[in-house]
UniProtKB/Swiss-Prot annotation:
Span of the signal peptide: none
Reaction catalyzed: L-glutamate 5-semialdehyde + phosphate + NADP(+) = L-glutamyl 5-phosphate + NADPH + H(+)
Gene expressing this chain: proA
GO cellular component: cytoplasm
Pfam families on file: Aldedh (PF00171)
Pathway in which the depicted protein is active: Amino-acid biosynthesis; L-proline biosynthesis; L-glutamate 5-semialdehyde from L-glutamate: step 2/2
Name under which the protein is recorded: Gamma-glutamyl phosphate reductase
E.C. number(s) listed in UniProt: 1.2.1.41
Organism: Corynebacterium glutamicum (strain ATCC 13032 / DSM 20300 / JCM 1318 / BCRC 11384 / CCUG 27702 / LMG 3730 / NBRC 12168 / NCIMB 10025 / NRRL B-2784 / 534)
Highest taxon of source: Bacteria
Protein purpose: Catalyzes the NADPH-dependent reduction of L-glutamate 5-phosphate into L-glutamate 5-semialdehyde and phosphate. The product spontaneously undergoes cyclization to form 1-pyrroline-5-carboxylate.
UniProt xrefs under InterPro entries: Ald_DH/histidinol_DH, Ald_DH_C, Ald_DH_N, Aldehyde_DH_dom, G-glutamylP_reductase_CS, Glu-5-SA_DH, GPR_dom
Cellular location(s): Cytoplasm
One GO term (biological process): L-proline biosynthetic process
Example of a GO MF term: NADP binding
Length: 432
């Protein structure tokens, strides 16, 4: 072994030292970034957008290294799609920064307030969270989204991306730091953490006192590991095992179009439809029409073969228990027949990740029952699951879709990246 070769323990020690050093540097600049004015923040975001486009060739070259390594290591094409960057996607990422620049700055917003009987003026205002850690998988666009939303909301970003996107993320952060430096702001406003081992994730999520919040974004394994292992507060952006229930009183052509859109528009994202639930009261021909339309769109059907063959379906892959709670992220979908809206609700309650659940029906009472009783961050009534998206909501870019119930639920946009502070201004009052 060469004298310059590091042992596994030395690599871990170096990673731990680097994570804690970067977290400390981030914590030290929190007071300055928290009070940065809206004008400077917007100027930085717009300059960063321009710089990303201007240096797109550098980004694409770095990204090509990641894609080459991914394919060499047998990465699935759905994951390659998440990883890939081209000029069009870089323009889209830059557009996201410009959009964030145009959004209302949440910092300092007065949520409520009044004058107390003794004359003290009190108000509750939005303030940044502080040091915001992000742990995410092979989606380099998250690097820029996290920076933009963190900066606009007055937060400092610590980013722990995937080793599969290390070249892309390194180049993106380098460009963002160059822009910050041009505006005489610390490069530590956004930092990329090492990703040689999984231990660096543990270093980040246990850096209590240095890191104020950690937001995991990725598959179920990653999210569970972060949430269960963290001593730092976390915001869970859950996986998307999204269901689409087609009621007997749905407009069938409309329902088919929505379920195909939810499945095929972009199958590798968390708002993709993963399970179609068919009302048993639908005619056999209507059930078959749904399945065949999905197959014609290139989607593989998983289900109880006997159940689906009973209404004429063919080429069905026998489903196991895993299929019902899977986030496929591919051109696969699970299909089941259920006993009306209550059957759909029961199935969803058992397998849902509480992300997005949808219903197609023309019956107002059925739609209301579904919306009232389903437990999810978003409920779609006669709309595709693909609409669960911060930009579609008019909120701009998002960190992720929170599926938990505390602090925030749904798209994590600017207001969701703040906390609050109570400010009381008196004239010398003392409490009796």
């Amino acid at each position: 072994m060469s004298s310059t070769t590091l042992t596994d323990d030395q690599i871990r020690d170096n990673e731990r030292t680097e994570v804690l050093a970067k977290a400390t540097a981030a914590k030290n600049i929190v007071p300055d970034i928290a009070v940065l004015g809206t004008g400077p923040k917007n100027a930085i975001l717009r300059a960063a957008a321009d710089e990303l486009v201007a240096r797109s060739a550098e980004i694409i070259e770095a990204n090509a290294s990641d894609i080459e390594a991914g394919r060499a290591n047998g990465m699935e094409e759905s994951m390659i799609d998440r990883l890939a960057l081209d000029e069009s996607r870089i323009e889209g990422i830059a557009g996201g920064l410009r959009q964030v620049a145009g959004l209302t700055d949440p910092v300092g917003e007065v949520l409520r307030g009044h004058v107390m009987e003794n004359g003290i003026q009190m108000k509750q205002v939005r303030v940044p969270l502080g040091v915001m850690g992000m742990v995410y998988e092979a989606r380099p666009n998250v690097t820029v989204d996290a920076f933009g939303l963190a900066l606009k909301s007055g937060n400092v970003a610590l980013l722990r991306g995937s080793s599969t996107a290390v070249h892309s993320n390194t180049k993106l952060v380098e460009i963002l730091q160059d822009v910050l430096e041009r505006f005489e702001l610390p490069r530590e406003t956004v930092q990329l953490l090492p990703c040689q081992t999984r231990g660096s994730v543990q270093d980040l999520i246990t850096a209590r006192g240095l890191v104020d919040v950690v937001i995991p974004r990725g598959g179920a394994g990653l999210i569970n590991a972060v949430v269960t292992g963290a001593t730092v507060p976390t915001i869970e952006t859950g996986t998307g095992n999204c269901h689409f229930y087609i009621d007997a009183e749905a407009k069938l052509d409309q329902a088919i179009a929505m379920v195909i859109n939810g499945k095929t528009r972009r199958c590798s994202v968390c708002n993709a439809t993963e399970t179609a639930l068919l009302d048993a009261a639908l005619s056999d021909s209507d059930k078959l029409a749904v399945v065949q339309a999905l197959q014609e769109a290139g989607v593989t059907i998983h289900g109880r073969v006997a159940e689906l063959e009973a209404f004429g379906a063919t080429d069905v892959v026998e489903a196991t228990e895993t299929d019902w709670d899977s986030e496929y992220l591919s051109f696969d979908i699970a299909v089941a027949v259920v006993d009306g809206v209550d059957g759909a609700l029961a199935h969803i309650a058992k397998y849902s990740t509480k992300h997005t659940e949808a219903i197609a029906t023309q019956n107002i009472e059925t739609a209301q029952r579904f919306a009232d009783r389903v437990d999810a961050a978003a409920v779609m009534i006669n709309a595709s699951t693909a609409y669960t998206d911060g930009e579609q909501y008019g909120m701009g870019a998002e960190i992720g879709i929170s599926t938990q119930k505390l602090h925030a639920r749904g798209p994590m946009a600017l207001p969701e990246l703040t906390s609050t502070k109570w400010i009381l201004q008196g004239t010398g009052q003392i409490r009796p």
